[in-house]
């Protein structure tokens, strides 16, 4: 694909195990991501994470200009600080040849400094004035289901991170909860993917991390037992698991506090976002295997029972068609 598109700019933020199920290791992931850098023409630009040796090794695969960012003292765009503690949003301080700058973002977690710094470096290297880049970064709206905030009226506040849940992303998600200011916190974790070894590792990692910062850990799906909670944690309610998102949603609503923060972390096919949406919408679709790789708001049928979706879509298409005909007439 990179050879076909022939990019002029390549940005590589990091190499992790997010794609472990497909590539089985960081070396293979790095090889695949490096194809983007290899496809650059000599006049192109590669923006690389100076802290990741797998990323920096890609510099050897191109004759294009290399610009680096990261914590390293040798980085062209050096991270001086990254601070986030919800409700205080991420603020990044960066030093470069243009000077020192503060970047205020709408992100809730410190992990997003990587994307923020990469975006700033790319913009400035392409000729955008630093002040304009800072302004655009500050106004960037975070996608609502990628660690977006959904505040409810008189209910809890949700951090919605329900696009994907590779095992490699679990620590950063729970770190957001750990560093947040609200006194009452819960973690709702669903299906975890791309783990090395068996599924117990993913569930156990999530539970071990959340145990240290959350008042309660709620697991949704078939693998809750693999977290191996103690009998005491089950009895006192520190750990609870549900098979279905609807069951978890009903429980959260019945036990919620208006001042609490709840992290929702799961894969896109599980649609845990419905737990938060049930506070702002009349959620009627609780299908567990709809097969859609879009979120429930994109689908547009969250307030329609799943067995009525086809009928509702036909009615909606008919209404749009009739509306178009009336305009043309």
Task: List each model region and its residues.
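ATP-dependent carboxylate-amine ligase
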Residues: 63, 121-329
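Acidic, Mg2+-coordinating active-site environments of NTP-dependent enzymes
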Residues: 2, 6-157, 182-183, 207-211, ...
